Amino acid sequence: MKTNSSFHAAGEVATQPAWGTGEQAAQPLNGSTSRFAMSESSLADLLQKAASQYPNRAAYKFIDYDTDPAGFTETVTWWQVHRRAMIVAEELWIYASSGDRVAILAPQGLEYIIAFMGVLQAGLIAVPLPVPQFGIHDERISSALRDSAPSIILTTSSVIDEVTTYAPHACAAQGQSAPIVVAVDALDLSSSRALDPTRFERPSTAYLQYTSGSTRAPAGVVLSHKNVITNCVQLMSDYIGDSEKVPSTPVSWLPFYHDMGLMLGIILPMINQDTAVLMSPMAFLQRPARWMQLLAKHRAQISSAPNFGFELAVRRTSDDDMAGLDLGHVRTIVTGAERVNVATLRRFTERFAPFNLSETAIRPSYGLAEATVYVATAGPGRAPKSVCFDYQQLSVGQAKRTENGSEGANLVSYGAPRASTVRIVDPETRMENPAGTVGEIWVQGDNVGLGYWRNPQQTEATFRARLVTPSPGTSEGPWLRTGDLGVIFEGELFITGRIKELLVVDGANHYPEDIEATIQEITGGRVVAIAVPDDRTEKLVTIIELMKRGRTDEEEKNRLRTVKREVASAISRSHRLRVADVVMVAPGSIPVTTSGKVRRSASVERYLHHEFSRLDAMA
């Protein structure tokens, strides 16, 4: 779909929608003291408001690097987004019934946004997903389709054949009928026919956010309009503080089917009624410098990336790429999704300091799909803070500073949680831990989702937890059990790892992220630390992605041997562990989630079945 930013129709003002009779209508958000508070009770209402107040303002600019390596800009205004979403909504109701799910399987682009907004306008439940690639994510997408059982799939003409072939097989296991597949760009989105926004329902549920599933199969988190709007308000308040300037022009390459990509790229611009500049994840991976260039050229104020995105930007952005560009206006770059590496943040700020990027713009943030996306970050105007904790003390659940930085776990602070209520809890006794003691992070607030789709047992266990003997001023429940391990140290939150990902080697607990951080100081690329069983206990195995650099086979063999020795020595020195096997593989070999997190359980299976193609086999 090639959009034309000059295409507008004057004089059309949407009317206030009537509540439907299906699900309970979403209630307005009341009682907030934030300057970002809003009375709109659904995302559909917010889109209608943006279209009414700023019809001619650019809403989304998508930079298409496939059409033109220099970047071809496609633009839609708020009026266009609302109008096209209404046309999609009318099409959906030809086939849909109240409460139906509508999956979105489309390439990153404006059509994805129109599809998502169309589902919300129709009062149906959106299920944002990636396009199936018949690769490592096949079963995960199939699992989400079987679980959500959509009646309709929205896609685009460029991939409709692939999606139409794929969908029946993905849904067949449940015995459900194949969903109807609709190409959004094949609809008459420029139609001038009269549209009635009051005909559609306003149910409480907005969409299902399927988790990235680093430790289990993806699960659909049920998120209400209230959850999403609340979290937007929390996020903006914490990132912007008391500033009168709301962040304009988000720049994002994060996939729309990921929680932060959806929030930053689609929803937050709608709430701010401003313009988002977007590109595809593939465009970023092909040339990471594009991200920094867009931040500078569009005077962006807010963006986001996981840890690996920062690494790629550092390694693959040259001074020539940044010639004449300035990043002084960038106020917030959120980093999360995977554990934040302190060394990565240091390299990033040092690399782009000559282009006026302030270190206070880097905002390590904690969140999860079960809490919509965002839970905590340090206050604005502060550079990232880290503390070096003693490895051995952490392994027994105590957070104590180490005097020797080389012998400790350097963890980044996520500040004192303000948006949500957070407690550190012993997962066995369900009692609150004192400050300085590691435990499971429990979260409470209106941003916490309603549960897992069609999984009441797991919903009860995860979203309905109750504290035993809560401290004064702390409610008994319900609480969200995050599955993340953390500690409150000197009044601030630090994340130590995942409960299910703790490595037990020789009877002692070890955080895999700490071991991986040690290795990355040597290798710089993606790495995964896993524990695999042997005859008596579990042994430590590390899998490291490396690019070939030796000019000859002999040079490459010597390099691989050197890396093996350095990795084994560093882990022994820092963690007092012996590595049973150091596996070196080509980039892209380690299985990851859709958000870039390493999948440890899948890595264990591949290792045990000898499925890694080892570069070190010849060394």
From Swiss-Prot:
It is an enzyme of class 6 (ligase). It holds the Pfam family AMP-binding. Its EC number is 6.2.1.51. GO terms for molecular function: adenylyltransferase activity; ATP binding; ligase activity. The keyword Lipid metabolism applies. It catalyses: 17-(4-hydroxyphenyl)heptadecanoate + holo-[(phenol)carboxyphthiodiolenone synthase] + ATP = 17-(4-hydroxyphenyl)heptadecanoyl-[(phenol)carboxyphthiodiolenone synthase] + AMP + diphosphate; 19-(4-hydroxyphenyl)nonadecanoate + holo-[(phenol)carboxyphthiodiolenone synthase] + ATP = 19-(4-hydroxyphenyl)nonadecanoyl-[(phenol)carboxyphthiodiolenone synthase] + AMP + diphosphate. GO terms for cellular component: plasma membrane. GO terms for biological process: Actinobacterium-type cell wall biogenesis; fatty acid biosynthetic process; lipid biosynthetic process. Keywords: ATP-binding, Fatty acid metabolism, Ligase, Lipid metabolism, Nucleotide-binding. Pathway: Lipid metabolism; fatty acid biosynthesis. Catalyzes the activation of long-chain fatty acids as acyl-adenylates (acyl-AMP), which are then transferred to the multifunctional polyketide synthase PpsA for further chain extension. Involved in the biosynthesis of phenolphthiocerol, which is an important intermediate in the biosynthesis of phenolic glycolipid (PGL), also called mycosid B. NCBIfam families: PRK05850.1. Belongs to the ATP-dependent AMP-binding enzyme family. This is 4-hydroxyphenylalkanoate adenylyltransferase. It comes from Mycobacterium bovis (strain ATCC BAA-935 / AF2122/97).
